[in-house]
């Protein structure tokens, strides 16, 4: 509303705004202005691969395309005029603030494929694009000013998941003023693109899987209105394919962590963590996509990340994790409040070797995770020596290093300046670590304990007595944790 020009028809202004709420003043002309801004759109040309049944194209175009085999083919496209939402509020807050911005395009694509995926729901935008009036402002004015107490039936466009009647025969209804406010929530919703993982040719691959919507539950209204625009302008403009790289997420919950990180960074220099914790109480999350003519809701939940969780997520970004499966598992553990290494034993046991130890990205991420764990160990742990994670890593590294020296006479200091010897060293190191990884993967319970004690600990280790006792106790009392850490430590050592 603050964006509307002052010297124009009608009344549409904010009378009061604070952290507890807002009061606005509207008349019928001001309502029309507000809705015209809300649903502003223009008719623009768009290429389509198939002709429409009941509408001739403006023209046809042929474009040369090169397929995967390098063969050049000509593909015909059909040009039509289509309505495109302007989203002026989002344009003002987008990095670069222009129509070509990928963040705004992402929001428009989401709107047209999900919230307005059914053509009939696009009528407010189509009317503005064609310069006509569909009467929605008058309808809203009538409902808001009616002296009769009543409710308004909600559609799925107003409220995600709403329907005429649910399975129990209950309709979705709300007070007129609440229905009026529901017109605006899409414009503060942050949109991201979840990535699904699939195993193809024994390698983990990623593909886009719809849209993740993040709807903030605002705790301090005025502060949020002041800080959100600044945070949105600071989003990265780096591109991955045809989407902003920062919009791609491995979990739907990561969308909320990203939004929280933006706001946290914005507030960190002036207000601190306490201000962020009060600014947003939580996030409503939805995972949507369009399948054929139907819009599917894959999940809907509420997520309330703590300040420490947002900070830990920020730490996960530097250095970046390379492997999509490793990254997703780390995020699942963060969101679930589990140790960072939880679940990797199951992954190693159920997926092909090529998707775990055999993937360079997986080994890189294991190294990075152990290094980060070392940096984050508490002062108490530092006073008593390394924690369990670092003890297991030390065992794995010592075992591989000793085997290299005993079997091949190789040490790092003797090969680091000779490219050929260095390559041979790396090859043999990976082979020794791989054999141990596969041996651990195939053993559980007592069999793993016997292998760990009889093979990995068969070479001299420089462990202090209390460290040896701690490791021995964990081997018997936390066998699965030690096994998981051993798999990761061998991956990190290769």
PLM region spans:
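Long, contiguous all-alpha helical interaction modules
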Residues: 1-95, 257-494
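Basic, glycine-/proline-tolerant helical and adjacent loop/strand elements
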Residues: 53-54, 59-238
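Domain-exit/linker segments immediately C-terminal to small folded modules
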Residues: 155-334
């Amino acid at each position: 509303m603050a964006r509307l020009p002052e010297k124009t028809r009608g009344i549409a202004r904010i009378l009061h705004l604070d952290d507890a709420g807002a009061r606005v003043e509207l008349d019928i002309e001001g309502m029309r202005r507000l809705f015209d801004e809300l649903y502003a759109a223009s008719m623009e040309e768009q290429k389509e691969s198939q002709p429409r049944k009941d509408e001739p194209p403006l023209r046809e175009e042929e474009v040369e395309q090169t397929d995967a085999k390098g063969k050049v083919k000509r593909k015909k496209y059909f040009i039509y005029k289509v309505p495109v939402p302007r989203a002026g509020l989002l344009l003002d807050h987008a990095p670069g603030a222009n129509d070509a911005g990928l963040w705004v395009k992402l929001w428009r694509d989401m709107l047209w494929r999900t919230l307005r995926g059914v053509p009939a729901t696009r009528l407010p935008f189509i009317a503005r694009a064609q310069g006509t009036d569909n009467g929605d402002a008058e309808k809203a004015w009538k409902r808001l000013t009616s002296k009769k107490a009543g409710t308004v039936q909600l559609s799925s466009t107003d409220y995600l998941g709403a329907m005429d009647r649910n399975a129990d025969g209950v309709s979705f209804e709300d007070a007129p003023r609440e229905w009026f406010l529901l017109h605006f929530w899409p414009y503060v919703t942050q949109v991201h693109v979840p990535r699904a993982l699939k195993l193809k040719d024994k390698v983990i691959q990623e593909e886009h899987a719809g849209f993740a919507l993040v709807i903030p539950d605002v705790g301090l209204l005025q502060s949020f209105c002041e800080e959100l625009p600044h945070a949105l302008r600071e989003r990265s403009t780096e591109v991955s394919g045809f989407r902003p790289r920062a919009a791609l997420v491995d979990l739907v919950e990561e969308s909320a962590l990203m939004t929280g990180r933006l706001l946290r960074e914005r507030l960190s220099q002036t207000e601190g963590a306490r201000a962020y914790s009060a600014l947003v109480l939580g996030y409503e999350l939805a995972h949507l996509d369009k399948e054929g003519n139907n819009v599917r809701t894959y999940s809907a939940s509420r997520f309330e990340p703590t300040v420490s969780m947002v900070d830990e997520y920020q730490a996960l970004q530097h250095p970046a994790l390379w492997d999509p499966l490793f990254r997703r598992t780390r995020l699942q553990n963060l969101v679930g409040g589990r140790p960072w290494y939880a679940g990797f034993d199951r992954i190693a046991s159920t997926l092909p070797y090529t998707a775990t130890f055999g993937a360079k990205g997986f080994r890189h991420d294991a190294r990075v995770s152990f290094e980060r764990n070392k940096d984050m160990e508490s002062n108490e742990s530092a006073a008593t020596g390394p924690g369990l994670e670092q003890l297991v890593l030390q065992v794995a590294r010592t075992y591989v290093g000793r085997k290299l020296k005993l079997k091949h006479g190789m040490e790092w200091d003797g090969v680091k300046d000779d490219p050929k010897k260095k390559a041979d060293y790396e090859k043999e190191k990976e082979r020794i670590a791989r054999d141990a990884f596969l041996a651990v993967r195939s053993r559980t319970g007592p069999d793993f304990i016997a292998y760990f004690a009889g093979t990995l600990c068969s070479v001299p280790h420089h462990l202090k007595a209390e460290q040896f006792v701690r490791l021995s106790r964990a081997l018997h009392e936390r066998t699965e944790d030690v096994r998981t850490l051993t798999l990761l430590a061998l991956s990190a050592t290769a």
